[in-house]
């Protein structure tokens, strides 16, 4: 009976989870515009930068774990298929977001940093991470690992990743380092390595397993806030003001990438606290607001991909023509608003009239398109790798001026 009840409950959407994902989408778009296109965005960027530090990818991944656990499709094979789909979509995004604009910039200017950025056709981005996470969960489910043990394994992976980061020199070969960067933090583009970030998915997966059985979610939310808020305040008061040995500087790229144990748990506490707040206020949302929130949540991957396609090609144009970024904060803020509105419009128009989604392709067309995406990616690397001596990564600012 419990199994039947769980399947029925899986048909229910939890508006607080949708609200958290929607908040992350909005913050993500503004943050990406400021970071990629603005020279010195100032005031507004401080808020979105801190939102990235305290919530950021952690909330995305926590919600992803919750969604995985509550999904109707629970067979390991279904998880594996979804994982490969996400890897392929991420690879398609890398081609059009990174490789193609950089190749065009190199053809226009001959500047070496453009060619170096072409190698970002393979990078440990968040969609790549999501694909690997689904594949890893498929393996764990095949091995009949329980939800709690999944959390234990994830914490062990996170700790091991940080120890390796502090003690082991990365490989001298960039391609090897990049491949390893999908799994552990290296000196390549390992922004979201599986070992560093899987802890959020695992905790979300565990929460998703118990969430439908919580009879009074509002009462539970109050308890979470009563315990969680003091713990969050105490932790970050220490983290911000005390130099802790072996810890990355607070709010640095290193902290975000390495995502070591206690920082990861603190991010998780913040995400759960925000989820609790949204649970308490969700009844006050009107039907229109709920519809918008659900739309953002359902299309989270599309918002990620489409918004990036309105950001990165513009960066290439700006650098190729004048090697300058947007001045101040007003123009970047207006452009971020435009990106949010335009992304929504593109997604709505596609859903109403075009109905094109790579992952919904069937049969031979699906096999051909998926294979083409991976073949093109490999060809890009074969062309680029022998022609460069420096490799663009987050650690060197992507070699950009």
Identify the residue ranges that each predicted region occupies.
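Alpha-helical transmembrane segments and their immediate juxtamembrane cytosolic regions
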Residues: 1-401
